[in-house]
C-alpha cells in the first residue's frame, strides 16, 4: 500500500509542478506602460495623427461569396480624429473610416489591482498592437477592396448620461444615391452592443449587399499574462457550429490554412485570459464563417451574412451584436447558445461547472469569495465524508499493525515473496484494505484540478479579496503564509499515517510536505486556501478515527 501511496503522491507532485509552470504563464502581473513623473493616471490618449496608428489594408474587406479575396490596394490612412463613446462599462473609440472599433477599455476592470485608475484594454490600434472589431457592407455596399467609407457624425464624443439607459451613436455616409447609417446602440451595464446598418436606397437600381463582422488581431501576447516557461492558457479564435458548439481555431491553424464554413446563426470569437470578444449574427441568418491572415500578418476571424436586397426607393436594415467584455457565463449564455463555453474548464468541465455554480451561490449569500471557498471546501468534505472515513479507518488499522509488519520484515529479511504473502495474510486477518489509504488522493485529485480551472478561468475570481493580506485570490500569496501553513498541515497529517516499512519510502514521504510547499508558493491563494482548509478538516477526521481505532472502539 505504501508503495502505491508514494507513487500517487509523486504523481500529484508532478501534476502540481506542471500547473505551477502554467500558472506562472497565465497569472503574471501585467506590466503597465512606462510613465514619466509628470504623467497622470488615465486611459491611453487617442492618437492625434495618422502616424500614431496602424494603417488599414484592403484585406480588411472580405470577399463576396464565390469571389477571391481582393489583393491589397493602396488605401487612405485611418482618421486622425476618432469618435469616443463612453458608458458605465465601456469606453471605446470608433474610426470614422470604416466605422471600426479600434480601442476599447473596461472601466469596471482595472488592469492591475494596485492601479484601479488604469482600465483593462481589449481593442487597441497602435504601433505595438493591433486588435479591432470590424464590420461593414460589401457587394453594393460602401466597403470596397479599394477603400473604406469615411463616415461622419454629429459629435466626436458621446457619453451615457446619468439616468439614461441607452446611448445611440449614428455614423452617416452617402454614395451612388444610397444613404447609409451605421448605428451603434449601447446600454447601461451591458457589454454587448448592437451594430446596425440602415440603408436608404434612393437610386434607380435595386441594392444588394452583405453584412460582415470580423475580429482582427496580431500575434502579440495576452496583456494579462507574462512570459514564463510552461503551457499558456488558450489565446486564439473560436466559433460555433451545429456539430461543434465550441471549436477552437488557433493562430497556427490560421497559419496552415484558411477556414470557410456555412453555419446557421452561431458566433465567432477571440479568446484571452478572463475576457472574450465575439460577433453574434442574427440567429436565423445563414452565414459564411471564415478565417485568414491579411497582408500585414494579422489574424482575422469573421462572418459574412446572407444577401440583403433593398429595392429602388425603399429602405432596409441589417445588423449583428458585438460582445466585448468579461467571460461572465450567465451573460454569455443569454447572448447565444454555446458562447458560455468560451469559459474553458478543460476536460474536467463536468466537475468544474457544478463547482462554479455552487461557489457562485455560496458567494451570493456571503459576499466574499474567500469565505465562499472555505464553505465550498466544507461542503465537498461532507460529500466525501463516508469515503474518507473508510479510508482513514484503513490507514488507522495499518498504523496499529505497524509493529507486526516490522516483525514480518525482520523475520523474512530479503525474501520478498514470502514477506508479501505474510503481509497479505496479515491484511486479511486484520480486515485491512491495503489500497484503502489511496482513496482520498484519488477522490480529491479531480476536484482539486477542477477547482484549479475554476479559479483560472472564472473572471469573478480576478482581483477578488479575502481578508488581511490576501487581496487577490487569483494570484499567489504575496507573503507565502498560506503555502507554509499548508505545508505544516500536510506534515501533521503525515504523522497520523502509518510509517512506511522501507526507509527510502519513509524519507520520500518526509520530503513531500517540503516539495508541495515549494510548488504551492506560486499557486493562486484561493486554491491554497482550499487545500489548507481541506487538510485541517482531514486532520480532525483522521485524528478522531485513529484514536478510536487505537482505543479499540468502533468509530461512529
Curated annotation (Swiss-Prot):
GO MF assignments: membrane insertase activity
Any GO BP annotation: protein transport
Membrane topology note: Multi-pass membrane protein
Keywords on record: Cell inner membrane, Cell membrane, Chaperone, Membrane, Protein transport, Transmembrane, Transmembrane helix, Transport
Residue ranges of coiled coil: none
Location of the region described as Disordered in the Swiss-Prot/TrEMBL record: 35-59, 126-152
Listed GO CC annotations: plasma membrane
Spans through the membrane: 7-27, 365-385, 435-455, 468-488, 513-533
Disulphide bridges, residue numbers: none
The keyword Protein transport is annotated on this UniProt entry: yes
Compositional bias ranges of the Low complexity kind: 36-54
Subcellular location: Cell inner membrane
Subunit structure of this chain's protein: Interacts with the Sec translocase complex via SecD. Specifically interacts with transmembrane segments of nascent integral membrane proteins during membrane integration.
Similarity comment: family membership: Belongs to the OXA1/ALB3/YidC family. Type 1 subfamily.
The protein's role, per its UniProt record: Required for the insertion and/or proper folding and/or complex formation of integral membrane proteins into the membrane. Involved in integration of membrane proteins that insert both dependently and independently of the Sec translocase complex, as well as at least some lipoproteins. Aids folding of multispanning membrane proteins.
The protein's name: Membrane protein insertase YidC
